[in-house]
Regions:
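Ribokinase/PfkB-type carbohydrate-kinase core domain
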Residues: 1, 9-15, 19-211, 244-245, ...
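Hydrophobic/aromatic ligand-binding patch that stacks against planar heteroaromatic rings
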Residues: 6
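Conserved post-catalytic alpha-helical subdomain immediately downstream of the catalytic base
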Residues: 194, 217-251
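Short, surface-exposed loop/helix-turn segments at secondary-structure junctions
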Residues: 213-215
């Protein structure tokens, strides 16, 4: 919902399927009224509860995600409408795969098992915390993404932070060395069109033909950093909708 709200605040028309427990968009207090008018919500169940402890040099997050699988049963009654919205979207952002693996099934139904036309130009991916995922599950997920890409011609983009980058490299037995070399190797291994890395001070774009970096603007004393990655991803998604070049996407 943070990504969806941020994209709507920048002018995008957004459909968001997530864990809202039946809450209407008018009740969500962190979204301004203009953004709410551009949002459609599908509630799939009760949200997980996350406690974030932020310090000057690090952050600890404690999430109770144990019931998410059971709560995702709410998907069944809304599957057709959600799949229709996915087919009609210019960009599809699939985030938080680590705790919502049902995303894979939904994508397979929409792209691989359907003869309906797909409007989407981009499939934007964010894995979230994959420390508990094994290498086989990760590779199976990206194989399904590669099948979607090859069948439909949709461009694929993975957004990862520095911690996720390190964990992903370890899971895939890769050396997390120089960003340029490792990101290129990772992109090839996962058969992706693009990887965007958002580290603490730098953002990096890597595709087959473009590799560029951009220094990130630093806020000296931020009130909160939880959700920063979601807001960054929202900016990337809107930039892609506007067909901005890679360096401007990072800006």
């Amino acid at each position: 919902p943070i990504l969806a709200a941020a994209a709507a605040s920048m002018g995008a028309s957004v459909t968001c399927a997530g864990m809202f427990d039946g809450v209407e968009k008018e009740e969500i207090d962190f979204i301004d009224w203009q953004a709410k008018e551009r949002m459609s919500l599908f509630s799939l169940g009760k949200p997980a509860v996350t406690y974030a402890l932020e310090f000057a040099d690090c952050k600890y997050m404690f999430a109770d995600c144990g019931n998410l699988g059971k709560q995702m049963q709410g998907l069944n009654g809304k599957r057709e409408k959600i799949e229709q919205a996915i087919r009609a979207a210019d960009i599809i952002a699939c985030v938080n795969w680590a705790v919502m693996p049902e995303v894979k099934e939904v994508l397979q139904r929409v792209f691989q098992n359907s003869s309906a036309s797909i409007k989407s130009r981009y499939l934007f991916l964010d894995l979230s915390d994959i420390r508990r995922k094994d290498s086989q599950s990760i590779q199976e997920y990206f194989r399904s993404i590669a099948l979607i890409k090859n069948k439909n011609g949709i461009k694929t983009c993975l957004s990862i932070n520095e911690n996720e980058f390190d964990v992903l490299c370890k899971k895939l037995d890769m050396d997390a060395g120089l960003f340029e070399e490792t990101l290129s190797a990772l992109r090839n291994k996962l058969n992706l069109d693009e990887i965007i890395l958002h580290a603490m001070k730098t953002a990096v774009f890597c595709s087959n033909s473009v590799f560029c970096t951009e220094e990130k603007q630093q806020i000296k004393d931020p009130v909160i950093t939880t959700g920063a990655g979601d807001n960054f991803n929202a900016g990337i998604c809107v930039a892609k909708l506007l067909d901005l070049p890679p360096k401007e996407q990072l800006n």
